[in-house]
């Protein structure tokens, strides 16, 4: 079973929460409370999402945030990249040298799985996740 990190899970939950309120400036504290994410962790995640131009923040005492792009332009892959998570299923699909690479039973199937995984993440956009 593939298990992604809490950081990525929180990033996806937070950005979906924001996308579900397209005409609002969303308060960071509201996201943290609603999605049960620590506010300090959420602020770090939001900083990464802002650096990659997925979110726009309004600085101040309250800390407001909104999408920087249309939901149909934000992919799950981009969110995953923004929080600096590894996109590799195994070391061999990452390109790390392995002496058994040419004599391995699983290299082909894992390579295909990696390509399908990446393609799926790139096709899945926020507008498909957050439907009104």
Where are these regions (language model features)?
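Alpha-helical residues within the helix-turn-helix
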Residues: 33, 50-51
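A short alpha-helical element within helix-turn-helix/winged-helix DNA-binding domains
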Residues: 29-37
């Amino acid at each position: 079973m593939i298990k992604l990190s809490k950081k990525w899970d929180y990033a996806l939950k937070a950005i979906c929460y924001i996308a579900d309120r397209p005409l609002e400036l969303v308060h960071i504290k509201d996201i943290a409370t609603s999605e049960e994410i620590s506010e300090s962790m959420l602020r770090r995640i939001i900083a990464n999402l802002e650096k990659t131009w997925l979110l726009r923040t309004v600085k101040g005492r309250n800390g407001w945030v909104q999408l920087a792009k249309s939901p149909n332009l934000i992919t799950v892959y981009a969110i995953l990249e923004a929080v600096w998570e590894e996109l590799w299923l195994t070391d061999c699909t990452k390109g790390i040298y392995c002496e058994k690479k040419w004599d391995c039973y699983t290299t082909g199937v894992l390579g295909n799985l990696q390509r399908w995984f990446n393609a799926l993440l790139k096709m899945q956009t926020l507008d498909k996740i957050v439907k009104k």
